[in-house]
């Protein structure tokens, strides 16, 4: 199997951590679309949102998603990449999509422990747990819709990677 593997889920679900470990296990390249966008635009997410608004950020996110998609690549997408029906169709058409699911409580705890997440602008202006609950409520169906596989992102990264490898191996056998 050489197709792109897309990791989707909310902020803090483990897309980058698990994506890096998965890429290493497969001998694939790893790309985080948020980091790619920051490097190519020379702006942080907060700066893009401040200067171009969330619509501008989402447009850049879509362009980054398409730019990094390549064989033998694991892509950690931004949490909101699924908001675009074009992005959802693109990911399903160009690879395997894995949704890392986690509860609002787990996500809030992880985000509170990550100093980089403090730099990220709020989507709603609400406290973090409330915002996560709102975001999950609005995106859960989209994550489910786009995903070929749904996994529990609260497990250890090594266990999740092992589960993904087993699923991918099972797909090759079929």
From Swiss-Prot:
Which is a Pfam family this sequence falls into?
Answer: SKI
* Domain-related comment: The LID domain closes over the active site upon ATP binding.
InterPro entries named in the record: P-loop_NTPase, Shikimate/glucono_kinase, Shikimate_kinase/TSH1, Shikimate_kinase_2, Shikimate_kinase_CS
Instruction: State what protein this is by name.
Output: Shikimate kinase 2
Look up the record and name the pathway of this protein. Answer: Metabolic intermediate biosynthesis; chorismate biosynthesis; chorismate from D-erythrose 4-phosphate and phosphoenolpyruvate: step 5/7
Q: Which organism is it from?
A: Yersinia pestis
Membership in a protein family: Belongs to the shikimate kinase family. AroL subfamily.
Q: Which UniProt keywords apply?
A: Amino-acid biosynthesis, Aromatic amino acid biosynthesis, ATP-binding, Cytoplasm, Kinase, Magnesium, Metal-binding, Nucleotide-binding, Transferase
Cofactors? Mg(2+)
């Amino acid at each position: 199997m050489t197709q792109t593997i897309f990791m989707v889920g909310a902020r803090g679900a483990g897309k980058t951590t698990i994506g890096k470990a998965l890429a290493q296990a497969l001998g694939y390249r790893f790309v985080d679309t948020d980091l790619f966008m920051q490097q190519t635009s020379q702006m942080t997410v907060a700066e893009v949102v401040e200067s171009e608004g969330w619509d501008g950020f989402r447009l850049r996110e879509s362009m980054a998603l398409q730019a990094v998609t390549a064989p033998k690549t694991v892509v950690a997408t931004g949490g909101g990449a699924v908001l675009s029906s074009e992005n959802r169709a693109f990911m399903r058409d160009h690879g395997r999509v894995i949704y890392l699911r986690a509860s609002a409580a787990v996500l809030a705890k992880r985000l509170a422990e990550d100093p980089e997440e403090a730099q990220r602008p709020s989507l709603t202006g609400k406290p973090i747990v409330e915002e996560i609950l709102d975001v999950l409520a609005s995106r859960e169906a989209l994550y489910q819709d786009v995903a070929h596989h749904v996994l529990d992102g609260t497990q250890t990264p090594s266990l999740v990677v092992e589960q993904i490898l087993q699923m991918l191996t099972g797909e090759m056998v079929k």
